[in-house]
Amino acid sequence: MTATANDKPQTCAQIIRARRANVETAADAVSLAARTAVLLLFAYLFFSRVFLLAQAPGNDMFPAVKDGDLLIGYRLQRDFSKNDVVVYTAEGERRTGRVLGRASDVITIDGSGTLLVNGTAQAGEIMYPTYPEEGLGYPYTVPDGCVFILGDYRTQSQDSRDFGAIALDDVEAKVITVIRRRSL
């Protein structure tokens, strides 16, 4: 380092301290960048492999889930129970629905709007009648490795009545929380 007329000559100790401070600042920056990268990688893996964040793609589950609501789902569960609300893919589109039948269950939908699973009428909180769609014959036995999914808004939703049973591989996650869009 060269001294100018206005600079005081520096001692060796001062020069060493200044260079050490520069090295420590650079090391701190690298450490911060590495920690940030690890945190971002963890967040990516957490939300791409363990949990699902998705916006409800329509009113298939109205009134329980409305179009635009934020859904938080658990991806690691593969054994779905009846009445679990799930996010699944059918015909290339993400959809939501309620699991009503599992492998070997017999689903019957008659012309009067009655839904039977293994001979038992399904009522619950559903206020819309369930009518069969063309193409799927009833009684229908759910194949192994599949689930039968219906939307709660039965008169407007596309679901297993249209697509048949949904393969477990096409079910992305079980919905564990719904955050209403209007509350954000």
Where are these regions (language model features)?
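PP2C/PPM family metal-dependent serine/threonine protein phosphatase catalytic domain
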Residues: 117-134
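Generic structural signal for buried aliphatic residues
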Residues: 71, 86, 107, 147-148, ...
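Protein maturation boundaries and topogenic segments
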Residues: 1-95, 164-184
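Extracytoplasmic/periplasmic/luminal assembly and interaction segments
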Residues: 78-117, 122
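Short, surface-exposed linear segments at secondary-structure transitions and domain or protein termini
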Residues: 105-110, 130-137
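Conserved S/T- and glycine-rich ATP-binding loop of Class I adenylate-forming
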Residues: 68, 101, 149-151
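Beta-strand-rich cores of mature extracytoplasmic or soluble domains
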Residues: 135-184
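Short secondary-structure boundary/capping segments
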Residues: 62-63, 77, 99, 132, ...
